[in-house]
Amino acid sequence: QRGDSDDAVFMAAGNVDDGSRLQESRLSSAVDGTGSASSVMSWATKGDVKGVSAASCVTPELEQRFLVSGTKTGMTQQLVVANPSTKATSVDIKIWGAGKSGALALSTGATLVVGAGKETVMNLAAAASDQDALYVAVSSDDTPVAAVVRTVAMDGLTSKGSEYTVPNNTMSTTLAVAGLSAGDSASLYLFSKADAEITVSWT
């Protein structure tokens, strides 16, 4: 579909109940303002994942990195890796925790096999338990993959919500975090490949 105004937007929606989906866009023309974008959203009114989770869709890459909240009691972190190609691939996982320097020795192994057109889920809480925060690196040698981290928070039997974390592959010397209001309780997670001094300010 082609449009010549800001209101000319084509939208498609559908249910995804049995695994990841691949979107492929082929534009008949490439002019300023054309393109495609996708997002995913899930919601539930009861159960362990009660609430709303949303994220932009992920572009397959050979390497993807995540900075996520930890694996203390009540927090479940699931790494979901999808392989859109026509051949299986092996994916290497490295995880750093908040307690010490260097990558952690994982309790569940550090390699995932993802079948062609399939997805594989790794329980990060089982692989690196009792951590205040995790930095996760996902690497595929030959085939680009798409990955997200699905977080579920529980307080005993009470659901505290769920969320998706998408890859954050860019490091910077200056970052700004929006979306906080006066009185909010917030935790800041930082990762550096080398020793560094960090200055945090609020405005």
Feature-to-residue mapping (PLM):
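Short acidic, flexible loop segments centered on an aromatic residue
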Residues: V81-A103, S140-D141, Y189-T203
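An N-terminus-focused feature that recognizes amino-terminal "leader" regions
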Residues: D17-Q23, D32-S38, A44-T45, T59-F66, ...
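Conserved functional hotspot residues at active sites or interaction interfaces
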Residues: S42-V80, V145-K193
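Intrinsically disordered, low-complexity linker/loop segments enriched in Gly/Pro
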Residues: Q64-G74, T86-V114, M122, A128, ...
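Predominantly extracellular/luminal regions of secreted and cell-surface proteins
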Residues: D32-V40, Q131-G156
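Intrinsically disordered, low-complexity Pro/Gly/Ser/Thr-rich segments with frequent PxxP/GP/PP motifs
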Residues: G3-L22, G102-Q131, Y135, T203
